[in-house]
Amino acid sequence: MNTSSQAVQQLQQAMTTTRQAASTIENLIAEHDYQDVAGLVTLAAAALLESAAYLMQGQDEAALESLEDADDLLDAVYDIIESDLGDGD
């Protein structure tokens, strides 16, 4: 059987790994197409994981803030992609 404490610990580990990936993406030796978008998606993933961890701890207000952060990051992703698609016309 699993406990909520185990879930929180695993979510925190996933957040750490995800944030490390975001840092790696941000600091690539050679620039990559959509590097900025990949970084934002990764940060959004970390925010979603953080929200889940807060929910598992009964911290609904903090969870909502993290969800809003993820939403803002994903809005930025869509803005970049839509802008790039618009440039191709």
Short names for language-model regions:
Residues 2-89:
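Long, low-complexity or tandemly repetitive, helically biased scaffold regions used
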